[in-house]
């Protein structure tokens, strides 16, 4: 084992990174070696056990905890580890598999062992239900009483150093906008769980010399601060923060290959990225960065809210947010603070003590007495109150949580660190949409291992080839509830969601709640009627277009203006949209850098969708999807809502940070996002004639109607000019399109059809040719996302099909002539959606579970369907 491990160490040293953490098999062999260690290897073996085994409920942690417990109990001897030393090492394992052992050791007759166990447990936060065991034991056991007293005092927090009054750093600046694809490039998605290896790809396209510059700046002797005009836009991937912190953060004791801390300064910091930085123990600061340049040595005064240069002159000021941020940094991150503070509060409550004054508590904003917006009511309901005012720190219940395959392995690792063995969120979904089409060996292993990891914790796991996370997760939503997901496009069309990085998603799934600083809302009101040839995707692009006309959004990154940044977009005026259509609007709020979104729909629309989804989930159970109990519970709650349908509405006197009216009567032609920025929206007529080499019709922004319409445009027109990619969002869409003969039309057009999933959208597997111009229905058009040097337009499927037909962006006249002839007369037939309850015998399609072996809702819930 040691020889193989040393070879691995040498291979990694060539890359300048540490070895991988030990797995369970290696840890088992290590523990055997430690029973009779070779003299020359004693120090190395101890280092491996202490520092290179993952904590929490990792399989290797299970082996380590068992070995150390056996030493502490005298069942195994190790010449290098005393009984007390074993207990001390158990105390470094954060929580999970070490907790029950430490509780048992509180009862040891060896007072040194019992005392060491008390010390170890006093700084262990991830105890969850074991809290009750320690509390009960404290009535009769003095060492358990020590633990309870330490938790009540907040000793875990007191023993951590405060954030200094002044922090001197060296600036590393990336001018303009840095998105998460720059920091965590999609083609390297498979390496994300391996933080040091993945971090080698940071800025490889944006600033290839960047990592060398950071290494040089570190020689000045100060920490390096990451600085940018706009930082962290785009995907929610926690790997972006992981990579940044790997280069500018500090090692976390006893947690291999992960770093915390660090300083991030941005003119604008995207909300998900900001939150993920908080969770990871970094100090993110929004401030004017115009006077900051690479190599500058500056001093940050966090409590005074100013930054000075080497001469002591103030060059910029800031206001820390949230008000608890310094506590978060001191605790090692927002998540450790929340867990630790909750443990201290819970302990003090059990002892009849008042809340601890040790922590900065969020200040509730003044109640204006005004009404609440729809979003504020939804979050209020999840917090057990009528509504939540902007600026309120709260922890809403997470009814639905989503995870996909390029973030799922990181979420799994975070869940292990959180010592999670079962989900408290009502439904947690894991999908395989980003890697199913062209899996690498590591992806195939993920496809094999991750479903069981999630389903054994009460989650639901989809299968490779099923399709896109959002197209499925939306079908599992309950109206007026709150959720999250490890993908920035987790933008519920029913209820509201706040997408997050993997750490916060793991927290939400494990604990069933999520911390939220309630954002302000911007109301987008649609008026007028959709004009001929104008699609819903054009209305998606009309939102930033109107905002730009009003000076509320700019494309330039220096002094960027974005009225939507960090706010909730609340949309109304299109109540009769189908839910699939509504998702086009909510989905695209990710590109506006919104923290979340809502859309007001009619009860009839929502009821139609839920009736369909009940049948889909029953079919999933028939097909053997797990966890069936979770699916049954969600079916029961949907049927309960259908029995008594009711939807929340915003109050007429609710207050918004801004109101933007989009008059559909004024949108006379398609609007596209031009290369290479989703905010760079233009009228189609401004781009007419631009040559298009490749066309992609796919992504979560599409539904079955788009493919029918595209096929109608292509039908009988021969082979398209250039390359056409077709990728439906789910296997159900694909099956229906095949049955309707649509795939035959795509074949005749020379299209390349892809397995249902994300395909080109993220650019982590299939990619377009270098340097081509693309028209795409996908979500984003960041530089190099779909292909190296690719220039990408974003717009509707209908316009995409016309571009494929003509090999260029059409004039308004060309476009309207085609769609008025080929689409408009058939709209009722083309834009039909998948209502599974209207498909004969759909519930039994692909059945592998016999009817008499199907679990029953009454058995799962212990109550009849629809019971209160």
Curated annotation (Swiss-Prot):
Pathway: Carbohydrate metabolism; tricarboxylic acid cycle; isocitrate from oxaloacetate: step 2/2; Organic acid metabolism; propanoate degradation. Signal peptide: none annotated. Pfam families: Aconitase (PF00330), Aconitase_2_N (PF06434), Aconitase_B_N (PF11791). Its cofactor is [4Fe-4S] cluster. [4Fe-4S] cluster binds at residues 700, 758, 761. GO terms for cellular component: cytosol. The keyword Cell membrane does not apply. It catalyses: citrate = D-threo-isocitrate; (2S,3R)-3-hydroxybutane-1,2,3-tricarboxylate = 2-methyl-cis-aconitate + H2O. InterPro entries: Acnase/IPM_dHydase_lsu_aba_1/3 (IPR015931), Acoase/IPM_deHydtase_lsu_aba (IPR001030), Aconitase/3IPM_dehydase_swvl (IPR015928), Aconitase/IPM_isomerase (IPR050926), Aconitase_4Fe-4S_BS (IPR018136), Aconitase_4Fe-4S_dom (IPR036008), Aconitase_B (IPR004406), Aconitase_B_HEAT-like_dom (IPR015933). One of its GO terms (molecular function) is aconitate hydratase activity. Gene3D superfamilies: Aconitase, Domain 2, Aconitase, domain 3, Aconitase, domain 4, Aconitate B, HEAT-like domain. Its EC number is 4.2.1.3, 4.2.1.99. GO terms for biological process: propionate catabolic process, 2-methylcitrate cycle; tricarboxylic acid cycle. Substrate binds at residues 192, 235-237, 404-406, 488, 780, 785. Keywords: 4Fe-4S, Iron, Iron-sulfur, Lyase, Metal-binding, RNA-binding, Tricarboxylic acid cycle. Binds 1 [4Fe-4S] cluster per subunit. It comes from the Bacteria. Involved in the catabolism of short chain fatty acids (SCFA) via the tricarboxylic acid (TCA)(acetyl degradation route) and probably via the 2-methylcitrate cycle I (propionate degradation route). Catalyzes the reversible isomerization of citrate to isocitrate via cis-aconitate. Catalyzes the hydration of 2-methyl-cis-aconitate to yield (2R,3S)-2-methylisocitrate. The apo form of AcnB functions as a RNA-binding regulatory protein. Monomer. Belongs to the aconitase/IPM isomerase family. NCBIfam families: acnB (TIGR00117), PRK09238.1 (NF006690). This is Aconitate hydratase B. It comes from Synechocystis sp. (strain ATCC 27184 / PCC 6803 / Kazusa). The lineage of its organism: Bacteria, Bacillati, Cyanobacteriota, Cyanophyceae, Synechococcales.
